[in-house]
Amino acid sequence: MKRILKNSTIAITLACIPAIVSASGKDRIGLVERPVPVASVQNIKGFVGDRIALNRNTYLKNFPIEKYVDFVVDRQHRDWNWTQAEQHGKWIESAYLSAVQSGDKELLDKVQHQLYRIIGSQEAEGYLGATARDYRSDSRPVRGMDAYELYFVFHALETVYEETGDKQALQSVEKLAGYFLKHFGPDKNEFWPSSLRHPENMRKHLAGTSDFAGHSVHYSWEGTLLCDPMARLYELTGKKKYLDWSQWVVSNIDRWSGWDAFSRLDSVADGTLGIDKLQPYVHSHTFHMNFLGFLRLYRITGDKSLLRKVSGAWNDIYSRQMYITGGVSVAEHYEHGFVKPLSGNIVETCATMSWMQLTQQLLQLTGDTKYADAMERLMFNHVFAAQDAESGSCRYHTAPNGSKPNGFFHGPDCCTASGHRIISLLPTFFYAQKGKDFFINQYVTSEYVGSDFAFNLSGNYPESEDVKIEITKAARKIVNLRLPSWCKTPVVKVNGEILNGASSGTYLKIDRKWKAGDCITLHLPMEEKWVMRENHSNYPSYTLPGGEIMYKEEPTDMVPYAFLRGPIVYCVDMVWNKHISNDDANLARDMRIDVNKLPQRQTFNDTESVMGPFYQTDANYMGRNVKLTLTPFCNIGQWWRSGEQKSWRNSNAFTYAIWMYK
């Protein structure tokens, strides 16, 4: 084992850590909205605050990170499996963000210690993964999944440097980058997904594994994803070699994939090709990670074709492949047409994480509130539906219709780690700024404490329709309030006076010299409605040679309905329907709901931390009329009833369903 670095002191103040590092000077395209330092978002309360605290205090603090850092430091890995070797990168980034945001010195001390253990194990040549030294050589410098695993190590080190200014993190990530620059590039190793080379690889269907680019069925994209953290390193250092390498990677995707997948993104943007047609298998999470790199290169170079490619892909996914909850991915990939099955391996947590990050990047680049709307829907519905409300562990898949608690307890694997990472990232999505402009994108009960401007945001939104923003530190600011597109009649007041110009799907700009005690209030009326599922079919499945699950369509006369309240998606969850006397009821077969009248609000008292309000609706279960309780989908992480013995963790004790038949 290499020595552990002794200097474990970072020059930060947990009370308020400034944005020490800025990448803006390296970019030709400035962000319309710049994220605020995570430490400036404080005292997050309500349902979201409770779940973020659960992630920090229960999951991250109790995670056996020592075991996984030992695995990296010992460096004896030779197998294909990637789940052990991706834990340290994701945990380091999550724990740093969570500790800095919350002012948690205990967690900060723990993550610093583990970070310096990892850095202390770094080889002289720069390698920082888990693969055994005697496995690697100049002709085989990494394992097949190293690029994917180290993607998160790159980003963890870069995030630590950006948020804290820790020079050791920067030095380490530069050494890691140097390892890839030495071994990959023109006339060196490349990210081929199989033994085939261009042009013999053109339009070939692949299966199996590759030497350096992950699963062959990803057609090189599981190696090329390093274009993003490498370009980020250019932004942090200004060293052109990192930009050149990132551009070299992207310029070869067509050749390596054998499907011209990068160039044909232009056809996706034109609307003449679905993203699923780019190659035989389009893995959602892997594509998102590459898209983040394309957007970063757009910022750096000003190449508008990159923005067009990614925004066009986002529009296609949003219009065809996004679920009502804001989640994406069908058995980890994108399907043809409007194929979106309701149960099974649906909405992978890894894809949730990278889709949220991708959407946030598009918001920052464009200032278009449609992206913030999509993030709101995803955050308040699917992000927390995937999280076990007791341990904080996250599911691999969280289908709209399914069963529990089976699915919450597995791993650690890619999705448990992606779950804690996206929850740790959430506070970075609430607010943004640029010059005198300040953007409030997500109405989560919290405090913002900046150097010249501060406020408290309260109101328990979205359980409540009302938001209150009280200024606590005054400055001249243009406050940009996102008015959601789903809200038809938003009302905004400053110190009790109604403002004109409040229009849904836009920012309302309020330009004034604020005084401490000034108060902004928003009233965002939420429509309650049943919605019929569009483009619904039956979806028989089949598999590719590598075992990947794919789907076909069959017509059906049975079309389900869901209940919405503003951005909140509801479900029938048998945890809250004990009176039906069948906790694992087959809801699709035996339950029919009355969609001709709206559900009524239900009074509910419980000691658990859940989002409300609850509703009651009429239904028929196996021939008898019943009252069903409808609850926000985000609550399905509670898989037990208060006061009752908990079921076996791997059981299917309770069923739930967003989509119900009438």
Features from the language model and the residues they span:
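Aromatic (Trp/Tyr) and acidic
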Residues: 24-105, 109, 138-164, 204-240, ...
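C-terminal beta-rich recognition modules with glycine/proline-rich loops and embedded aromatic residues
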Residues: 246, 310, 372-381, 386-470, ...
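Helix-capping and short linker residues that terminate individual alpha-solenoid repeat units
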Residues: 119-123, 165, 181-186, 238, ...
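Solvent-exposed beta-strand/loop surfaces of large extracellular or lumenal domains
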Residues: 487-512, 530-538
